[in-house]
Amino acid sequence: MQLGEQLLVSSVNLPGAHFYPLESARGGSGGSAGHLPSAAPSPQKLDLDKASKKFSGSLSCEAVSGEPAAASAGAPAAMLSDTDAGDAFASAAAVAKPGPPDGRKGSPCGEEELPSAAAAAAAAAAAAAATARYSMDSLSSERYYLQSPGPQGSELAAPCSLFPYQAAAGAPHGPVYPAPNGARYPYGSMLPPGGFPAAVCPPGRAQFGPGAGAGSGAGGSSGGGGGPGTYQYSQGAPLYGPYPGAAAAGSCGGLGGLGVPGSGFRAHVYLCNRPLWLKFHRHQTEMIITKQGRRMFPFLSFNINGLNPTAHYNVFVEVVLADPNHWRFQGGKWVTCGKADNNMQGNKMYVHPESPNTGSHWMRQEISFGKLKLTNNKGANNNNTQMIVLQSLHKYQPRLHIVEVTEDGVEDLNEPSKTQTFTFSETQFIAVTAYQNTDITQLKIDHNPFAKGFRDNYDSSHQIVPGGRYGVQSFFPEPFVNTLPQARYYNGERTVPQTNGLLSPQQSEEVANPPQRWLVTPVQQPGTNKLDISSYESEYTSSTLLPYGIKSLPLQTSHALGYYPDPTFPAMAGWGGRGSYQRKMAAGLPWTSRTSPTVFSEDQLSKEKVKEEIGSSWIETPPSIKSLDSNDSGVYTSACKRRRLSPSNSSNENSPSIKCEDINAEEYSKDTSKGMGGYYAFYTTP
């Protein structure tokens, strides 16, 4: 009958929940909640209101159709039999507390109370009409929150005692949860996501009882469902999993602040310039090592997440051998040639200069190791912490270490779990003293704006390489005439100084204002013809090269006097005065004029002297000191300017064929003691 099925569902003893006959609660308020004891201890009344609303229809002791009490009282066993209950209650009945002493199953209604509950019958009839049938599948885990009476009422303040449990026989503290095999409802549905920390649980009691095949509660929980008695209380990581093992597995290894602060934090590291590293890695990255130390390119740069913001960490890079082989570049590729030398002594670690620092500091910004230098100097021991000693033709692997330390930077050597190591295979490189693969060299030139130390050597030795990337002229073009297209500038951001004897400068003279480059100014041939190799080699000295640290002056052309035709000189008529010329020459010059005296006197200058000075300066004046709009040498321009400024020769100012020999030596020497002395003092003044 309808009432029997509803009573059957509600009358089964739930795990840890007890029901009492109504005769013990006659003095209560009655109604649908009359089946609960009115004198129960206050800690046990957790969900009484909820229970009265949810079970009011099913806990009624009167039939809906108004059957007599005798008919209902005569068949309590049939309504409460295990056969009618079904297999769905087998697991739940296994953990039920024993029933009353008379051998009957516990029932919320006493047999003698059935005919005398008129008010309960009316409430049951109304509830049965408004509510649907109850099935066990519709009961969620919150139905189990009813407490059982017992001496453990004093432990309700702790979170571990919120749920009913069966104390072990003869033991003051049993496990918090019993361990029946094959329980219908997993305990994970009632636990918070991470369980409870040990600080709030009694130390003598485990959070989980040992099931079949589980040695302990903690072991069963961390087993991950290894046996029928293993409990997966949440979908996350185990609460007290072993930190080293979890670290090896790449998981969190803990639940943040639930354990020891800082011990459960696992860092996540990202290689910032990974696309650039991959470009080099395709061709096998090479890194130059020198005695003085050479910085890496690409350099190591990381982003770090997942650290404890308040903990302190040391961040450093260690460079170790990637394999036990010795390498060499043969046939356009790297091949092994023996075993590596593992006896190389020297510093192998570079500590970031901002170490130690807090986790929030490391996570706030990009961590760059741009100042790390590589050297092959064995004398660079641990005293020089900025250089890492490597051996040429060996493959190395950089590794990033993050070590949790104290505030003063002291590392706890007894806890290796505080060290986290990260390796990126694309950062492997072979240490070399000179680049072997031209692809790597080209990548360095294209991406490294400060790669000047090898650019001139590489360009002079590889400028014959064919291809669209190189705008280099072929051998013996149009027998060394001046009709070739401009080939000084490539498509990329670099300039090849053509300094080979076979490929002496072949530039055309049509480029008026070439753009500036961060390059060494190429030395151009100042001889009388383009095949004069001896004069070219004599002028290729160190004084004509600019230091790498300054920006070079504009690249200009320089030729002997007889090379230019006369119609080219009218372009000089538009020059400004002396002051504007000196401002154009204001760039720092690392040399002094070798042919220009500081002060000229009238008795020191003669016609032969002037001609000799002018003739020699055409050859010895460095070509890179010309201004941006000049087309000839500096001494020639100064002499022509003096003639232009002379009032006696103003009629010849616009002459199309101005020659330096036309200048009157006497007029020239009159002003040199006053004007030219200060003019040439510019070159000799440091």
UniProtKB/Swiss-Prot annotation:
Known DNA-binding region:
276-456
Q: Which GO terms describe its molecular function?
A: chromatin DNA binding; DNA binding; DNA-binding transcription factor activity, RNA polymerase II-specific; RNA polymerase II cis-regulatory region sequence-specific DNA binding; RNA polymerase II-specific DNA-binding transcription factor binding; sequence-specific DNA binding; sequence-specific double-stranded DNA binding; transcription corepressor activity
Composition-biased stretches (Low complexity)? 34-43, 646-657
- Relate the induction remark in this record: Up-regulated in CD8+ T-cells simultaneously stimulated with TGFB1 and IL4/interleukin-4.
What is this protein's tissue specificity according to the annotation?
Expressed in CD8+ T-cells.
Give the modified residues of type Phosphoserine: 107
InterPro entries listed in its UniProt record? p53-like_TF_DNA-bd_sf, T-box_assoc, T-box_DNA-bd, T-box_sf, TF_T-box, TF_T-box_CS
A single GO cellular-component term on record: chromatin
Q: What does it do?
A: Functions as a transcriptional activator playing a crucial role during development. Functions in trophoblast differentiation and later in gastrulation, regulating both mesoderm delamination and endoderm specification. Plays a role in brain development being required for the specification and the proliferation of the intermediate progenitor cells and their progeny in the cerebral cortex. Required for differentiation and migration of unipolar dendritic brush cells. Also involved in the differentiation of CD8+ T-cells during immune response regulating the expression of lytic effector genes.
What name appears for this protein in its UniProt entry? Eomesodermin homolog
Q: Which gene codes for it?
A: EOMES
